């Protein structure tokens, strides 16, 4: 027995896939841009997490609160693009590697920076966007 997938459901799956592919490419581009620096502190991951959190705040207001874009854009941008662009798993493994290699001070500062800056970025983005749109 074959069940047909509703067209709207298929469109949402494709929206997430498109956004996810673009987000993954953007994430990889940031990694390449920071690669020559050879820093002990994982700046690329911190950058995408904070920037992604800021953008999540902006698009939360624009798409969810104000409905300024069609709902499908939530799937493209928030779920697909920003879901692939930001990276909790890389953040986790980098934190563990820093700790295991004896750089526990860097590991702790990295964890604190990611959490505090990312949450702050969402808050600032929401407040600013609500005032501007």
Curated annotation (Swiss-Prot):
The entry's keywords: Cell inner membrane, Cell membrane, Ion channel, Ion transport, Membrane, Metal-binding, Sodium, Transmembrane, Transmembrane helix, Transport
Activity regulation text: Na(+) is not transported, but it plays an essential structural role and its presence is essential for fluoride channel function.
Entry's Gene Ontology cellular component terms: plasma membrane
Residues of the signal peptide: none
Membrane topology classification: Multi-pass membrane protein
UniProt-listed GO biological process terms: cellular detoxification of fluoride
Single GO term (MF): metal ion binding
Entry keyword annotation includes Ribosomal protein: no
Ligand binding (Na(+)): 83, 86
InterPro entries per UniProt: FluC
Principal subcellular localisation of the protein: membrane
UniProt key word Transmembrane: yes
Subcellular location: Cell inner membrane
Catalyzed reactions: fluoride(in) = fluoride(out)
HAMAP family named among the record's database cross-references: FluC (MF_00454)
Function: Fluoride-specific ion channel. Important for reducing fluoride concentration in the cell, thus reducing its toxicity.
Name under which the protein is recorded: Fluoride-specific ion channel FluC
UniProt gene name: fluC
